[in-house]
Structure formats: C-alpha cells, structure tokens
Amino acid sequence: MKRLAILLLLTTPALADPPPGVPIDPEMHEYYHSLKVPAGPFAGGLCCSVADCRNVVVRSDAKDGAYYAYIDSKTYPDDGSYGHGHAPNAWVKVPEQVIIHDRPNLTGEPIACWYMGEIRCFVPASGV
C-alpha cells in the first residue's frame, strides 16, 4: 500500500531520502518534512526520517485517555541501519508531549515515529 511505503523525516539530510525502491508522493514528502517534535528534549526538530515513522495500529485506554501504539519488529526492523532501537512487540504508551495536535493527518491513519527505543512523534488518525 502506497501510504505504508511513505515514511517520515527526522533530523539529518542524510536520512531524507527513502530506501531504494520506495516511491515518494511529493505532496506527502513535504507534509512529513513539515512535522516537528512538539515538546521535550527534541522540541522543534524534525520528527523523523524515512526509516522511523510508520502507520501503526493504535488503541485508546478509557482509564487514562492515552493512546497506545503497537510497536513491533516487523514494522520497525532493527537492522542497524537506521537506529530504531529494539522494537518491543508490545503496546507502547504514547507520551502526551509527542502528540502533534496542530495539523491534520494527511494519511488518515495513525503515525508513530519510533527512534532509539522511544516514540518521538505521534500523529493521531484524525490529526487536529
């Protein structure tokens, strides 16, 4: 699916190009480049590289109102080339400070950016 092949960008121009053979929609490429880490130690930086962000399965918890993203090694392989860190094959609570609320989600599916063993950015399916 084309949307699953489109990935987000994080910090360095060296990571701004997609892996070989992955088609890029120019409009979506610009959208991903516009996403910034909303808060925390990486605030203001680009959310992700093409290797770090994916559409993910998400659930909400009625008790705490938080999002949980399923982070698995099939979606985020740790082959050493992108610095994903270990994918726990588990539901991971999305920290409130990494949720992007200021723009719509053009993919229509939840996006999580998993980098160095943590979620750096998250865009809900509905966006704002």
What positions do the PLM features span?
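N-terminal signal peptide c-region/cleavage motif recognized by signal peptidases
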Residues: 11-13
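Short Fe-S-cluster ligation motifs
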Residues: 69-106
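C-terminal partner/receptor-binding element of secreted or periplasmic proteins
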Residues: 93-95, 101-128
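N-terminal secretory signal peptides
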Residues: 17-70
